[in-house]
Amino acid sequence: MPEIPVTTSKAPPPSLSCRPVHVRTSTVAREAVLCAAAAGFLASLLVWLGPPGADFAAHAYQRTAFLQHGFGFWNNFWYAGRYSFVTYSLIYYPLAAVFGIKLLAVFTIAIAALAFSVVLSHEWGPAARWSNWTFAVVWACIVVSGAFPFALGSALALLAIWALQTGSRWKFGVLAALTAAASPLSFLLLSFVLAGIGVARWREGRKLLVPAAIIVAMGGTEAVLWRLFADGGRYPFSWQELLAVCVFCVLGAALTWRVERARPLRWLFIVYLGACLAAFAIPSSLGENVDRLRYVAVPVAVLALSLRQWRPLPVAVVTLALATSWNLTPLAFSFVKTSEDPASAQAYWQPAINYLHGHLTPSYRVEAVDTAGHWDAVYLPRAGIPLARGWFRQNDYPQNRLLYSDDGLGRGSYLAWLHSLGIRYVVLTDAPPDYSARAEAKLLQSGRSGLTQVMKTKHVSIYSVPSPTPLITGPGPAAVVGLSESQVTVRAAEAGTYRLAIRYSPYWQASTGCLDPGKDSMIRLRIPVPGNVTLSIHVNARRALMAFAGERPQTCSR
């Protein structure tokens, strides 16, 4: 489509490159709305007619927890205790509670497609058209992964870049803050994009100072939150995934080399490659999550190729094929995996829930052999049954690391792990297991685990742990008499120091006695006199300041 000149008395809105806009606003708006409509329609089909995404179960449970208990800092029903929302998403679950997971997902997909189209059209004009449309298609498919907070954060990040294009710094600041509140990972990727732009436009330094200051301030705020609510977990990052990132970034940088209009894109590839190498070298809760840019690999590749007019064509075809594979492979895997999971209905889990309600006491928790769809992490804790695991892989490390061992799972190490976490029963289903649960399922099915099968239905089996160790152990008889999301009550017959198999946090407070962390990160409770002791999570300024300073707050009560 030829360019249509526009005569106007007003200066055009500034783009990131500070060059005049080359297309009419009406043309940009029309294409953006069409892209948003297409993305929203496709997302609607996938979210309502397709299988639930791989992460859908996690968000379903977290939304339930928010509806039932509000914004809690802690949850005892996953991973022997963990921080709930504060370092993951501050605003997604309140929004999901109001609008529902599926409707919110469709809305955020449509908004992202709208903003992406506007941003690229303002920056690159008609050359961005095919990139806009491929984004509308592939971004809608992200609902198959169930990465809904990330999708929300990405929509807000794109709106932030749009605000920056129009020169509205205060809107950019607000939207950048909302991006961080929706998804720290989306904020991190926004930082990479802006860093690439900043390097490419370094001659416009003064214009970049305010946006850079905003990003640094928000990044500092996120770092403080992670310091205050550190969980010590890490997310794996395989060398195979790193290799795929490297190929994508090196190819992208090569294709945009000496293409002046693609200068911001070239530096994005370089900055992103450096960030991924750092994430691989430094174990953290980020890990492989840093490669989420793969979900837009196709539109990014199409943009890079369009800016060089798809020359040479053989190289362009190979590049697009590689980008398509990297973009769509995890989505296709998630689609197939969740389509084969029969465990998404509550009726599937009801026999196990009924049995556990009749036999499990508060002094023990349950291990559910994780399924491909992770629905055990929804229906069992919803029923008030505390789990040794859940669905937030970062929290599997280090306490559940042995389940990921490449050397198989032995009977002795498995029993020791079950005893260390106060597990009384193990639930095994006929649903396809998660990759981290294959060795565990195989051991149980072999009959050599040392556990006794105590219940079996068409889909579910329950095994009893021999000589189970309760959640609380110490010098005298003791029991857990009450357990909720952020509170636990124990009864001890003798004074002394007890081990409580719940993860320590500096925000735990006991009604009487003293709290300390053990070497295994579990609570050590010093009880001065026999009786009941209630532990609850209390987040206040004094404890937060001490946690930030790396000091243990005074945790003794009279």
Feature locations, PLM:
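Active-site lumenal/periplasmic loops and adjacent helix-entry segments of GT-C-fold
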Residues: A43-W130, T134-S154, P184, P342, ...
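Signature aromatic-anchored transmembrane alpha helix within multi-pass, membrane-resident enzymes
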Residues: Q309-L328
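Start-transfer (signal-anchor) and selected internal transmembrane alpha helices
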Residues: M1-S44, S557-R558
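Transmembrane signal-anchor helices characteristic of membrane glycosylation enzymes that use polyprenol
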Residues: T27-F56, T221-E222, A323-L328
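Extracytoplasmic
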Residues: P330-R558
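Transmembrane catalytic cores of multi-pass membrane glycosyltransferases
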Residues: P51-A58, Q62, H69, F73, ...
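Cytoplasmic membrane-interface segments at the C-terminal ends of transmembrane helices
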Residues: H22-V23, L114-A128, I161-R169, V193-P211, ...
